Amino acid sequence: MFRKQLRRIKVYFLKFIRTSGSPHKIALAVAIGFFIGCIIPIGIWGQTVVAIILAIKFKTNPGIAYAATWISNPYSVLVLYPVFCFVGSRVIGSDLSFHYIEKRFVQLMHNFSWDSLLNLGSYFACSFFVGAFIFGIIIGVLGYFITYALISEYKKRKMARIITKRQKKNS
């Protein structure tokens, strides 16, 4: 089963790498997806809609932008969201401790309701969105540069292979 999962990851990675478009456009789509994936909480359909609209606006690949929003998924939010809240609380000057934030998130995850979410309070929400915005920018920028480097390198190697093949064919 583990090999099957690795194979699936490899297939999707190769599809991503082989996507048509300039390295800038592909990297920009990843950056948009990462940013939106951080600042809009999961479970809200707006994450998908906003990522696709921004991708279209910036003339990038909406599919890649949508896929990149999955940086926040049910598994990663268990780590990301408390970190967002902690960093945001430090920026806005709130005294929320990481232990308190983590404890409240665990309670919320085990017994979710909209009332319990609203009862977290405005400081909690404000610290979340400030931290998410900061991390969204950082992760988006990192995602852009890493993706740009990977795609550029892949396209250079691909072009070198094509040139080498043509030279062998012509000689």
Regions found by a protein language model. Give the residues of each.
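Membrane-water interface at transmembrane helix exits
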Residues: 33, 37, 55, 72, ...
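Transmembrane alpha-helical segments in integral membrane proteins
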Residues: 127-152
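Short, highly charged, low-complexity non-transmembrane loops/tails of multi-pass membrane proteins
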Residues: 154-171
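Helix-loop-helix hairpins and the membrane-proximal interhelical loops
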Residues: 1-23
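Transmembrane helix boundary and interhelical junction motifs in multipass membrane proteins
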Residues: 39-53, 57-67, 72-84
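Transmembrane alpha-helical segments and their cytosolic interface motifs
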Residues: 21-44
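Juxtamembrane non-transmembrane "cap" segments at the membrane-aqueous interface
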Residues: 83-112
